């Protein structure tokens, strides 16, 4: 990479579309539901149904989505994903009018640009497949690791694959992952207690320290399963203490809490020496509530050993968990796994409006996966013949590729567009016919009037 880089800070949702760059953020209620399903299956800490900002810096997921670059504010407490190497320090250009002038990002001037050494191409291939049913038996961090080894295919598609029957593709049911779950201890600070998988928080911003020994060269995850938050009006706990007070004092206290409502948003912060992450979930009666109860928080990669992390509870209340796990993911085999996926990949890629094309050459049957979200509007042509499009890894387009050299073309058309145009044309034609008939029957009151 050569030359100067600049970044325009107009921080807003859908910034990638606004600035005409490829990105991992979206805020659109009519967006691709498969992408949201993927984020949910990965238990990503995104907290709304129609909005997401990246993939929580999870290195494997970034590579699987062909992410090449990563931007970080210089000096920020931000753990850089594994495999991303700094290539440039860049400057911020003049900000846009709608930027938040009070934000730290607006006021910052220097950023570091990193390049992913393990980014996968737009089309890469698998030798192994795993059914969705077998895949769902693993937790979300294990699932992330499995995606580097086997393609996830819907159960009915696995049964119909001739490549599995003839031994060209291998169906796996039991996968060994590069993850471990170290033991941990929870040390409560002031204003919080922990008992039977439940945190009782008596004051805002109370903290616990989770002590655990983490190996070096690992990515550290916190897995919250069955997360539930409850709280009640503080007035309920003051009934006994109010009995000896005067009516005036009782009224003052009662008036203070009469309009009390539970928090709109529930905040948890996770901190290590090198990373800071925030998790937000919402009250059940709000439009932003997702119904999700499982969350994974990535505390980043570190080439040194770690001894633990802090959790800060932003709200008073009761936080119940079915299970809390600390999971570390090793990268000892990461490079080898990435190279296996890109060994046979799509080359000579051409991107035009609604069309993606490329070449692929393989000496055995492979499952080709595109880092493009699946949508029924896509059609696939291999050597000019229309072929079956599969949903792979819950979110991507895919297809079985037979041995040989092939030209692969993807074409997109908005689902229902053709029939919509036909129906619209018929409707307009019928409207004109009705208008002409009405005009002939009622010449004194024509619908279609000539210009005078």
Where are these regions (language model features)?
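Active-site-proximal, structured, solvent-exposed surfaces of multi-pass membrane proteins
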Residues: 168-452
């Amino acid at each position: 990479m050569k030359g100067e880089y600049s970044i325009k800070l107009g921080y807003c949702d859908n910034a990638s579309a606004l600035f005409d760059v490829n990105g991992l953020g979206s805020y659109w209620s009519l967006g691709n539901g498969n992408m949201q399903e993927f984020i949910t299956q990965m238990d990503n800490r995104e907290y709304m149904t129609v909005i997401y900002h990246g993939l929580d810096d999870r290195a494997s997921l970034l590579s699987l989505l062909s992410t090449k670059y990563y931007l970080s504010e210089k000096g920020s407490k931000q753990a850089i994903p594994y495999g991303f190497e700094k290539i440039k320090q860049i400057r911020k250009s003049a900000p846009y009018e709608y930027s938040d002038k009070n934000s730290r990002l607006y006021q910052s001037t220097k950023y570091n640009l990193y390049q992913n050494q393990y980014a996968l191409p737009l089309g890469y291939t698998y030798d192994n497949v795993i059914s969705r049913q077998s895949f769902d038996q693993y937790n979300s961090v294990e699932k992330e690791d499995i995606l580097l080894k086997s393609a996830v295919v819907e159960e009915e598609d696995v049964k119909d694959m001739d490549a599995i029957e003839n031994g060209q593709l291998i169906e796996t049911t039991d996968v060994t992952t590069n993850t471990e779950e170290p033991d941990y201890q929870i040390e409560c600070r002031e204003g919080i207690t922990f008992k039977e998988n439940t945190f009782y928080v008596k004051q805002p911003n109370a903290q616990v320290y989770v002590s655990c020994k983490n190996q070096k060269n690992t990515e550290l995850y916190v897995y919250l399963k069955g997360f539930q938050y409850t709280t009640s009006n503080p007035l309920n706990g003051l009934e006994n203490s109010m009995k000896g007070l005067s009516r005036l004092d009782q009224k003052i206290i009662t008036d203070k809490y009469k309009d009390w409502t539970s928090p709109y948003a529930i905040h948890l912060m996770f901190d290590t020496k090198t990373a800071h992450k925030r998790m937000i979930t919402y009250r059940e009666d709000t439009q932003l509530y997702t119904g999700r109860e499982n969350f994974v928080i990535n505390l980043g990669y570190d080439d040194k050993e770690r001894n633990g992390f802090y959790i800060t509870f932003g709200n008073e209340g009761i936080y119940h968990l079915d299970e809390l796990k600390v999971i570390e993911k090793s990268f000892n085999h990461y490079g080898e796994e990435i190279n296996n996926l890109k060994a046979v990949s799509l080359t000579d890629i051409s991107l035009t409006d609604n069309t993606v094309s490329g070449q692929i050459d393989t000496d055995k049957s492979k499952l080709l996966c595109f880092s493009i979200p699946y949508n029924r509007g896509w059609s696939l042509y291999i050597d000019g013949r229309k072929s079956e499009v599969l949903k792979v890894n819950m979110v991507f387009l895919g297809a079985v590729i037979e041995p040989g050299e092939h030209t692969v073309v993807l074409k997109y058309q908005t689902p229902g567009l053709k029939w919509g145009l036909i129906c619209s044309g018929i409707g307009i034609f019928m409207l004109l016919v009705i208008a002409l008939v009405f005009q002939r029957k009622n010449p004194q009151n024509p619908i279609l009037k000539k210009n005078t």
